[in-house]
Structures are given as structure tokens and as C-alpha cells.
Amino acid sequence: MHCDQCQESIKGGCNVRGVCGKDELTAKLQDTLIYAAEGIALCAEGFEGKIDRKYGQFISECLFVTVTNTNFDDVAIVEQIRKALAMRDEVRALAGTTPAHDAANWSGSTKEEFLAKAAACSIDSLSADPDLRSLKSLILYGIKGLAAYTDHAAVLGYHDDDIYAFYVKGLSALTKELPADELLGLVMECGATAVKAMALLDKANTETYGNPEITTVKTGVGTRPGILISGHDLRDMEDLLKQTEGTGVDVYTHCEMLPAHYYPAFKKYDHFVGNYGNSWWSQDREFESFNGPILMTTNCIVPVRESYRGRMFTTGMAGYPGLKHIPARPDGGSKDFSEIIELAKTCKPPIEIENGEIVGGFAHTQVLALADKVVDAVKSGAIRRFVVMAGCDGRHNSRQYYTDVAETLPKDTVILTAGCAKYRYNKLELGDIGGIPRVLDAGQCNDSYSLAVIAMKLQEVFGLENINDLPISYDIAWYEQKAVTVLLALLFLGVKGIRLGPTLPEFLTPNIATTLVKLFDLKPIGTVEADVEAMMAGN
């Protein structure tokens, strides 16, 4: 295996076992699944870049399976490869052309055949040239992230055919020998498509569940048994809340599901009581103390402990060997969570690990409703600078940097955040500026879109020609592929001077990293003191 797609990849990439817990066989099967998706894209070129929505949505699902910490279940991945090959053959027959590339023509049906195929379709096979391979990796990981966002929107019935068309263009490009400038153009096109994907998901979520509003979320526990729901899928949240109503079972969010509390549609459920725990990487301890069932709707899963294995469930694209998987919902119906609910009734209430409050719900509609107050605070000097600290959290101690930055920033700064990076500072007592909290949480990682909308609105209000003239600095934490997608979206929107940490991606060669620095002033993080001083000076 060779996997370098996440921030915690070891130097040179993970080659024996992933830091995430993924073993060599799972890694190889995921490589083969990506190759099968590339085959679908190649065959779809016969439709002049257009692809039927059914196939586009399926590609989203295939790529989502391979996002870090999403699916470790070899049986499920093998079945997905079989489906992908059948889809590819269907597309090839409909297109009436047969591309010469092996990805469009190979066949197999067994796990052994898929593992054998992996040798020819690993990341290393993208190009013999390290720099071209680096650019192709950037494209692939960007597409993986936007596929996750697009899949969430599709679950709610929202689609954008331009995104599916980019799958065809982008994935096909991975199989071809293209020059660096053309690949760099595709990187930027991936960023443009990422903006579309995040806008689509924002539209899907808000039209379905309402615009997020300022909300105080409790972090303590009640006296009744509970179900803990983690991941990002709001439709799963809706199904679970409806089915648990009146059962005597409470529902708690974990990690990236925290922002579900901000949506008006979910506020009517009295048994939707709070958030339990912190970021994804501490789940092994928190799932143990929760006592009740856990539902993982997407990433992030860490290796499962025996102490809670019997009460942990997966659904959607998530999977883990030995865990019960809740099947997809039938057309027009809901998922059946009855087994989880009945198990919850037999469990003890959660053990309290903290008892406080978190304030969030500052997506673009809510912040723009406060625009006059924010603009006045900027003009008066009460707010000197905004610092965007969106992105991911991770287990390495180096991420203490983000806590320290939040504590070191002057009291006339406001932190704009989205994603699980917030857990590094969203429980600190950082105060407010004239009633505006100094940490404004927009929501999940895809809600970084809200931060971009807010920035563009402020640019308009202040009459600035360039988004980089705003008093906004970007100190982004990344971990997996959705953060890569967010980064590419920001670069496409013209944002420069982004700090990216805690380390630059392992898949970027020195030459490609230098190119990104030159084009976009992308920079690694430094010391807390130096970075805060530079950001406050507009650098």
C-alpha cells in the first residue's frame, strides 16, 4: 500500500498500515475502487462530458467510501467494486465507444482479483514524474471531498449536473499523461466545482431544515438512556429524531453532528438534548462512557474498542468490520433505526464528562442578519480583525497550536470557524465584542462556504475590489480530503496568504508546494507568537 491522503500520514506516506487504522488489504481495495470509478468516467467521455445523474451519484458514493476514516469494511468495498464495474460496462455500452485504457476494460469479480489489480492502480501509478503525480493527487483528493458534499446533497434530493460532469473530466484526467499547466488548471477547476458543491449542500440543508440560527447547546447529560449520532448526514439525524420521539430515549450529537442543533427543524424535538464529547479522535474514550448505542453516519471512525463494539452501528458510506450496518432507506421512505432504539432502552444513561454550553449557529444568513452590527464594530475599531480558523481537528499534539492561537489573539479579534477544528477552542472563555461572540461557529466543514459568503458580503459592503483587502486572515487546519476541497475552493475564490497546518500535505512535492506558495502565497504555520503578530499586521 501507499497512502498519503491525510495530514497524519507518516513521512513518505503510510506503506504498511495507515495511521488511521486502515490495513494494507483495505487500502488496496480502495485503490481498486477508485480505478473502477475512473473507468466509469473514461467511458462517460463518450457522452461529451455529460453523465446521467444515476452514474454521477454512484461515483460520489464510490469516492466517499475512500475518504479517510469512512469505511474499513473489505466486504462492503468489494461489493462496491463489483457494482462499479457493472456501472462502467453499462455506461460503455450506452456510449457506444470503448476507450483503450485498461480502466475502461479490465474485469474481475473476487476479492483476490481486486487485490491483484491494486498493484496497477495505486497512487504511485498516477505518474512516474513526482510533480505530475503530486498534482494528480491534489485533484483526486479534492474530488473525493466534493464527492462527499455532493453525496450529502443528493441524499436530500439536490443535484448539480456540472459537478457530475467534472467527475468525468477530472477522473479521466488521472488516467492520462497531461502537462503540469493543464493539471494545475484542473486543480483550479476542482476548486470552482468545490464552491458549487458546498453551495449545493448549503441550499439542500437550509431549504430542508431552515437557516441555522444562534443556538446554545448543552454538553451535560440527562437521566434517560441515549443514542449518540456522529458524522455529517442530517437526513439520518431527521430519521432518528422522528423514530425516537416518545420512546423515552434521548438523542445526543457527537463531533461534526453538533451543528444539527442549529437548524430550526430539529429544535421541536424535546428529546434532542445536547452534544456529548469532543472531536472525532477522542471517540474511543467517549463512546465507552456514553453507555448507549452510537450511530456513525459518515467519517470519522477510529479503530473500534471491544467495550462498545456491540452497540456501535454504521450507515451510509461508513463501514467497519463486525459492526451492524443500517441499510439505505427505500425510495420515498426512511431508514429503519428500530434495532438501535430498542438497544438504547436496555442501556444505562450516559456518564457525564462535562457540563457546560456551546454557542453556535453563525452561518451566513445569521451573520448577515447581524451585518450592521458587525460593520459598525469594524468601522469603530471594536473589531480589528477576523481570523478564519476553519477545518479539521486531529490527534497530534501539534494541534495545540490552534488553541494557543485562539488564546493569544487580541481581544478585538473574532474567530470564524467551521468543521471539527472548532473543538480546539469552542469551549474556551474568549468573551464577546459588543455582544458578538469572539468565536462564530458556522457549522460543519462544508459550512466553510458560509465563511466565504460572509467574506464576499463584507467585501461588497466595504466597497473593496479585492477580497484580500478585507481585515481577514486565514489559519486553516486540515486533516482529510474535505479540507483539501475547502482549500481549493478558497484558492479559486482568490483568497491568498492562507496558513495551512499543522503540516503541509505529504503528497505535495517541494516543487508543487513552491508553485502554490508562488501563486497563492500559501504558507505553513510557524510559532504562535510570530503567526499572530503577522496576521494582525495583515500578513
Curated annotation (Swiss-Prot):
It is an enzyme of class 1 (oxidoreductase). Its EC number is 1.7.99.1. [4Fe-4S] cluster binds at residues 3, 6, 14, 20. GO terms for molecular function: 4 iron, 4 sulfur cluster binding; hydroxylamine reductase activity; metal ion binding; peroxidase activity. Hybrid [4Fe-2O-2S] cluster binds at residues 232, 256, 300, 392, 420, 445, 480, 482. It holds the Pfam family Prismane. Signal peptide: none annotated. GO terms for cellular component: cytoplasm. Binds 1 [4Fe-4S] cluster. It catalyses: A + NH4(+) + H2O = hydroxylamine + AH2 + H(+). The modification Cysteine persulfide is found at residue 392. Its main location: cytoplasm. InterPro entries: HCP/CODH (IPR004137), Hydroxylam_reduct (IPR010048), Prismane-like_a/b-sand (IPR016099), Prismane-like_sf (IPR011254), Prismane_a-bundle (IPR016100). Gene3D superfamilies: 1.20.1270.20, 3.40.50.2030. It is found in: Cytoplasm. GO terms for biological process: response to hydrogen peroxide. Keywords: 4Fe-4S, Cytoplasm, Iron, Iron-sulfur, Metal-binding, Oxidoreductase. Coiled coil: none annotated. Its cofactor is [4Fe-4S] cluster; hybrid [4Fe-2O-2S] cluster. Belongs to the HCP family. Catalyzes the reduction of hydroxylamine to form NH(3) and H(2)O. This is Hydroxylamine reductase. It comes from Chlorobaculum tepidum (strain ATCC 49652 / DSM 12025 / NBRC 103806 / TLS).
